[in-house]
Amino acid sequence: MSLPGPLIVQSDRTVLLEVAHPDAGAARQALQVFAELERAPEHIHTYRITRLGLWNARAAGHTADEIIGTLDAHAKFPVPTGVATDIRETIGRYGRLVIERDDEGLVLRSDDRPVLEEVRRSKKVQPLLAGPVEGGIRIVDWARGELKQELVKLGWPAEDLAGYTPGTPLEIDLVEDGWSMRPYQADAVTHFADAGSGVVVLPCGAGKTIVGAAAMAATDTTTLILVTNTVSARQWRAELLARTSLTEDEIGEYSGQSKEIKPVTIATYQILTVKRGGEYAHLGVLDALDWGLIVYDEVHLLPAPVFKLTADLQARRRLGLTATLVREDGRESDVFSLIGPKRFDAPWKEIEAQGFIAPAACFEVRIDLDEDERLEYAASGDRERYRLAASSPRKVETVKRVLAQHPDEPTLVIGQYLDQLDELSAALDAPLITGETPVSEREVLFQAFREGTERVLVVSKVANFSVDLPDASLAVQVSGSFGSRQEEAQRLGRLLRPKGGRTASFYTIVARDTVDQEFALGRQRFLAEQGYAYTILDEHELGVADRVTA
């Protein structure tokens, strides 16, 4: 008799996963398509089936029958009838409304007239519509993006079939000289090209830049690439020159340091959000050329002002690249509406099993505050408590012990508070890179790390995003942005470039019985969803880590 499955599906749309069950890995991978992890204690993980998760799954080609079948296949007990009905009804809402284009402009259509009437009567939708036409309602020319946002809020996400401007033609070919696209990268490009807009979710280190380059080659058009910072812009430039037929003269950088507009222009999010006299000073880059494709790197970090700008770019093809759709500001639905639905998602452990990213062992090392620190902590307000606990001087000695256990590993020590990082830099005799470090100096230090002349770097949040340090195999995290799941994923991602079968090590140092420990649990949720387990160690048990990674 076969063992009952690892899932318990509950009538409130939560799903419990028994972590120790032999089929837990397969069930977790199946759940990622349409559910979100809410809690991840040691033995039972709790997922929630959300509307946005179901709509993303539907946009990626999954049906209600397939999703219910997945739950049935892995469940210990029958799936509640109400949950199955709810899934069918929620999936059925996606695409009931469509946005199309006729000779006069944009039209909102539906075969379900009551739905059309319901949305037409919404006070927030009314200003976006111009009046009835045969089979639908005329959409105001500028309102395509804003209408999609409002329809998601009403629970009727529209399928956008209005097409895209081709942009100015630009011949771009992949130059596969000594390398070739991995199967999952090719699949991601195919899914994006078929749809014309949307988000590709791949683990850190899995080659999202190559997916972007291949999407550019598939569209053969002028392209605007939006990235997190100048270092990332230069890495994109180097990759495009190495992987495509593009030349130096065809790629421009639009950032704080440079203002070039070329057929392929790489701009930073920061420059787009600069204001002068209450106006965005650099919006001209969005209309500088007839862009046929806009690539949003690290789309989960898209600043709120750029959402408004993106709402006006709905006629352009849009590709979002990210390791996680998690946004700490809760604006996942805006990514869905304005960039597009999730088109492709490759689970981290699946890519690891194929050998394309390194395996990683994760540790949480708990330290005790001394008595004076505990008294100061007890007398402090909530926000100051995290700073006190996260930047405890006790962490410096613990970091030194971790590094002593990994004497030859290329190491990143990552934190949030600059005074703490200054102390660590001095204690470890290692260079410090922060947001204040000039870009030219950062690049010199990153290159020294790649070449092995610097083995340890102490870095602030600047290393969270799009920094190519393929040899890093040890990261020690001492503080972060409170309970940020996306930051945890980005930091682990610094270690996941393939290492010839060697396992990377990711340590988080936390102060026991404080909000630092509570936030650490929250930060780990996304990686638990991807199948990573944290080994909990006391600071005096650090030798155990050697046995785990050996």
Q: Each PLM stretch: what is its role?
A:
Residues 458, 465-480, 505-508:
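A short beta-strand element within the Helicase C-terminal
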Residues 1-167:
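Extended alpha-helical interface modules used as scaffolds for assembling large macromolecular complexes
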